[in-house]
Amino acid sequence: NEPELWAKVKKIMLPKDYIAYRLTGVHCTDVSDASGMLLFDVKNRCWSKEMCEICGVREEQLATCYESYEKVGCVLPEVADELGLPHNVVVAAGAGDNAAAAVGTGTVGDNMCNISLGTSGTIFISSNHFGVDQHNALHSFAHADGHYHLMGCMLSAASCNKWWMDEIIGTKDYAAEQAQISKLGENHVYFLPYLMGERSPHNDPNARGTFIGMTMDTSRADMTQAVLEGVAFALRDSLEVAKSLGIHLER
């Protein structure tokens, strides 16, 4: 949409890759982050010539793609001196945030799963084999050691709780608010956590957040509970999609 800026683009890199470039002088990225750029052939772990042609991206604009554990290069001597580092410090390609967290939590191999909560929330399911969700609800990415993963990502997760506490009820005392919740399994107030539209598994930018089921007896604690449960069940939506694909989670 901004051709005058696009014409000036020499290399396409993600933020961590730019840092690696400044350290080593090497234009690089890794397979996990490249998988989310819509220019990557995830199954074959290389740039997609077809997608690059469609998008008008030239091969020389793309960084060299590495496995996450591979050496990109060493810190340049002048950079090492400036930072007070030894010479020949090795820089690895690294990984995207969720992929790195998955390795740290042992989410590698077949049918392992972790959940990550931040502004957004993810369901991350590792696999030894490449797989595609034909309904386009879950994303297919390259993962560690030649493996792959499926990921469901909701746009508003812990940010829903922050919005509710900061903007609506005006307190940061999370423990006090949650201590008032006593109707586990009995609350009839529901919250749809689509404050910024939704990605997985609905792919609907026009989805909006909603409280449902309120009565004159509804308490603040009921609504706080509904926000927490709404996020949990929105994550479960992606989990149910994974199960419908025949995935049987081991953990």
Task: Name each model feature, range by range.
Residues 71-75:
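Gly/charged, well-structured mid-domain segments that form the phosphate/adenylate-handling core
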Residues 1-29, 38-49, 53-54, 77-251:
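Active-site core segments that coordinate phosphate-bearing ligands/cofactors
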Residues 35-39, 60-70, 150:
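A glycine-/small-polar-enriched, mobile loop at the entrance of the PLP active site in fold-type I
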